Amino acid sequence: MNAFLPCLIAATLSASPVAAQSVFTGTWKGDVAASQVSTKPSIFAITNGRYTCSTCKPVVDVLADGAFHPIVGNPYYDEMSVTIVDPVTIKRASRKGGKPSGDSTVTVSADGTSLSTAFTDMTAANGVPVTGTTKSERVAAGPAGSHATSGSWRATNSGEVSDSGLTFAFAVEGKTVKYSSPTGVAYAATIGGPAAPVTGDPGWTSTTVTQPSPDTLVETDFHDGKTLAIYTMTVSPDGRTMTSKVDDIKYGKKSTLIATKQ
C-alpha cells in the first residue's frame, strides 16, 4: 500500500458487503505528527569510500564517488549514486532505465544525535512527485573512521510530506473496494476474493481485502506473490479518523498510521 511515511516510506499507506455507504468511502489524508512510526532502526555507513545500507532490501553496497552504480533487485531503481558533500552531509540519487526515480540530502546535526533528510520520490508512473523531510534519532554510532552520517537511526514522526504522498481515496461499492492515490496507484479488489492487480506501483503488484467488521478492512499487499505488508484499517465511530495498524513483513517493522477524512 502507498503508506504515507516513505519510504518512512515510500513511502508510501495498504467479509461482508456494506449495505449503506461504507465508512471508508471518501478521500483521506495522512497525519504524520499523529502517527507512530516503527522503532526498528535503519543502518547505513560510508567507510573507506563505500556506501553500505545493511537494512535496505536488497542490501546496498556502492562506491560513494558521485557516479551512478548498478543496483540489482530493487523494483524502483536500477542505479544509485552517493556523493559526500561535506563532513556532515551526503546526497543520494537513484534512477531506473536512465530516468531519475529519487534523491535525498542527508545531514547530521552538530552534536551528531539527529539526522535530517530532505527527499524527492519520483517513482510514480504518472510523474507526480512526493517530496518531504524526515528526522531520525541516533541509536548507535557508525564504524570507526566512517562519515558522520553513518550509524543506526530510528525514525521519528517529526517530518513533513507533500499532499501527493499523504492523500488517498477509497470507494466501497457492494463487495468491491477501490483504492486510488494522486501518484496513480490504484486497485479494485473484491472483499474476501482473490488477489487483485495493483497498477502504478512497480513494488506493489497485487492485494487482497477482507472485512471482519463494518468499520474495519484488512488489506494484504504483495509483490510478485510475496507478502509485503498487512494493513488493518479501522474507522472511528464518528467516521472522521482512520487508524491503520501496519505489519511491514518485508522490513520487519510495525507502525500505526493515522488519517483523517477530508
Where are these regions (language model features)?
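Sec-dependent N-terminal signal peptides
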Residues: 4-15
